[in-house]
Each structure stands twice: as C-alpha cells, then as structure tokens.
C-alpha cells in the first residue's frame, strides 16, 4: 500500500507527482520532465496552438494522471489521518480539478490532514489532555476553546477520568453585551461543544441536503424537482459531521499533551507502561478544573466575552497553565482579550516543546544503551550499579498508584537521595583526571549540568522539569559524538542515571 511518505519524498524534486505501476502494484514517482514534456506544457498555454490535437491529447493525459494521483493520495491520507482529515485536505487543498500534485500541494494537504486529525505524540496515550479550539473570525464568529483531561489507564472503566472544561455564557449574548459580566455555564463534553459550534441555519441546510440526496438515490435523478436538486448540492464541509445521536456538529482543532508519570499506548496494551518525564500535571489540572466548575455554580466566577480571564479561551488556558504549561513555554497574555486563535497558538507551542523533549529523552535512552556495546564499559557500569542496588521504578509505580505508605515513600526518597549523591560522586571521580586542555566545552557543560540538576526531595514539579530538560538536552548534545574513552562513556551513563533519579522524584512530586 502506498503511504503518505512516498508522496512527500517524490514531491521533493519539485515536479508533479504521478502514480504508475505494474503487476506488483502502484508506484509513486515524480513525472518525467524532458524536452517533449516542457514543449507540450508551453504549447498548452499558447492560445493559437492549445487546441491542436496533439497538444489537447497531452493536456488531457496530464489531467487524468493528476486526478489519479490525487485519488491515491487522498486514500493514503485517509489511512494515516482518518476519513475526516483526508476529506478536509481534499476540500481545502485540492481546489482545481486536474491540478498537478506538486510539492506545495502535497505539503498543504498533509498539513490540513494533520490539523484535523490532531497534533501531538500523546494522541494514542491512555493519560492525556486535549486542548480543542474553533477558529475565531471576529465578534460575529468568536469560535470557542475547551480542554479535556482523560485518564483511561485503569483496566476498570469505572475508574476512568473524563473532566471537560468548556466555559459558556448562560444566555444568548446581544450585540452590546460583549463586555458584560454574566452568569456562566459549563458543558460536560466535547460532543455538546461540537453541536454548539454549528449554526441552526447550517444544520437545517445539511439535513435538507442529506434528505434530498437520499430521495434522489432512491427515486432516481429524473424524478427530483428543482428544489431537491438544489438542496442535494449542499454537502458537509470538512469538520461537519453527524454524531452517533444523528446531530450535526463541527469538529475542533485538537492539540494533545501527555500526562507526567506512567503511561501506555491504548493501541498496544501488551507493551509495558513507560514513564513520561515531560508532560502536564494531571492532578493539578483536575483540581483547577473542579475549582472552575465550583466557581461557576457558586457565582464566584462570571463569563465575559471580551476578557483576559473570563471567556472560554482564558478558562481553557487557565487549566492548561495549572498543569505546568509555563514550565515549557512562557505565557504572554493578550493585550485586550484572549481568543481561541491565540490560545491555540500557545497550546501548539507547548505541545511542540513537550514532544521535542520526550523525543530527545528517548533518543538519549537509545544512545546510552549502545554505550553498553563495549565490554569494558558494560563491566565497569555493572560494578557501579550493583554497588548501589537502588532502582527508581518501584517508587515511581507505587507513588503513581497511591499505594505506598508515607513512611515507605519517605524511606524510598531517602534512598534515592543517597543514590543521587553516589552518582554525583562517581561522575566527579571520573572527571577528576580531566582538566585543562583535556577538558573540552562539552565536558564542562555536562559537568555543570550534573552539578546544577541533581534532584532532591525538596524539588517541586517545576524544578524537576527544569532540571530534567537541562540535563536531557545537555547530555543529548554530548552524545552526538562517540565517546573518546571508557571514562567518557561512563560519565554519560552516570548522567543518564541521574535522569532516572529525576523521574523517581517526579513520580513522588505528582503523587503528593
């Protein structure tokens, strides 16, 4: 099966993409652009010559190739991003019939499909936060923003968490009430948000169009009257679809964030749970989300459409920031009023930073594993590890599940603090002989990071996130070059072990 990557790779040449094939199946490639093709392409734009049989046949052949390429490309997008993302890419990206599928169009259609599918590596995770927004196009179409906290990690579905924060006015706003503080209401789910973001007139036309097409399909086109034929032309746009209750709604732009702590891919339950070091604090977000809802019930909080703190976008951002978004990207408030577009841009920036750090963390893990290929390094590191015997995993698992007693938790924290000191001393011992001309900038940066980023039981989530990001990025740069000696490889393994201690303290911090 042809995938999206094949189209992206073929489009890099700048030529239009075509789909050919043989008995083995379809093949994507860049169209040949020789002297003949260049000549016919030129003649197809000359008024006196474009109607010649040879030129017309060439132009029709190109149009057919472009249509076939587009059909296969949309199918590939559907396989990767789902039918909704592929439909959006077709609606917004393939505007002219028979237009060439070139690098710009491939890039735009992939971008549109990704947008409707959702952005972020956390989408398949069991513990995630979803920031949703509908585009703001002025006061008449203000859009919306909401946030959902999901936790489906427990095998018992009754213990799953679904907390949705969606801030709305409790009454329909008039044209002069944009600055008024009025009573708020909160909606309980994304499905209700979707229904609220489609106008009654649009919903009516969608129903009429669907009914007309069904009638024409059943009775035949020739029996349809003019009104039915007209209604049948009104198709749903990208994002407009029926839910399982047969209600029309408009899908949002989605940005996915991982929750800090143990997590797993819902698509592959056989894989062991892995610790996510960089993410948002689920417990803190749940507390703030419930505070917001209580404030709506008590009347302490109000809704004001043009506001930095009391509209839908500002409330969604409030809960996002409560989870530690500013540990990754500083937040800058809007000058006059928050809006879904500004909120979406900030959410994207936070998601990109979190995903980049987690990818860097995984890359560091893989590279440090390869350091064990050296027998001497493996033996030396085993000797050091066995001398300590402490492990971060039991603490992290127990802290994350809330099963460890306070006494046991403190004992484990003390054990990890001793291990931090031992790793630091081992790193200093390995570095003792390297000074002056034998110590390069990378060594100095790593030594400084190890000194500044040693975790402790006093660190909160913000401090641990800051230390982890500095150490991961510094070690990642250090690993770009192969270690010149065994001591250099062991220093890198010591730094990697320190990241493991940060994970252990992080697990305790989010469980506190």
From Swiss-Prot:
- Primary localization: secreted
Record keyword Hydrolase present = no
Entry annotated with the keyword Secreted: yes
- Family matches, as InterPro entries: Globular_prot_asu/bsu, SptP_N, SptP_N_sf
Q: Which residues form a coiled coil?
A: 347-376
Record-level GO cellular component terms? extracellular space
- Could you list this entry's UniProt keywords, alphabetically sorted: Coiled coil, Secreted, Virulence
Domain of life of the native organism:
Bacteria
Its localization reads:
Secreted
Protein family (similarity comment) = Belongs to the BopA/IcsB family.
Q: State the protein's purpose.
A: Plays a role in mediating bacterial evasion from the host autophagic pathway.
> What's the protein called, per UniProt?
Effector protein BopA
Q: What is the lineage of its organism?
A: Bacteria, Pseudomonadati, Pseudomonadota, Betaproteobacteria, Burkholderiales
